[in-house]
Amino acid sequence: ILSIKCKCKIYFIKVDDILYLEVLKNDLTIHTEKGIYTFKSSMKEIESNLEEHNFFRCHKSYLINLMKVNMLDIENNIVFINQNSIIVSRYKIKLLREKLNSCLVDVII
């Protein structure tokens, strides 16, 4: 469970419910199956906590949950999660494919 302090509230978000995170300027947005949470933070602060939970930084602005990926468009460097298209850095596409293959093998076994 990830705890996020936003103004006067603290949200408790199940890591498994997180689809992806995106950052724009100083606003970090967490997209989940149940809603969207936006607050002031940097991606680095949260990234280290989520890497061990099959999350991957595919672009400077995006951190994705590998277990939620529906499709990878290698030609256009785009990953799809629940109808959302997310840009993948061309420098990270190969590593993303490896990570996805690793996750899929872990799930199948």
Mark where each language-model region is:
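Eukaryotic intrinsically disordered, low-complexity regulatory linkers and tails enriched in Ser/Thr/Pro
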Residues: 1-8, 90-109
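Conserved binding/recognition cores within well-folded domains
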Residues: 1-81
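Intrinsically disordered, low-complexity sequence elements enriched in Ser/Thr/Gly/Pro
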Residues: 38, 55, 88-90, 95
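Short, conserved aromatic-histidine micro-motifs
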Residues: 82-87
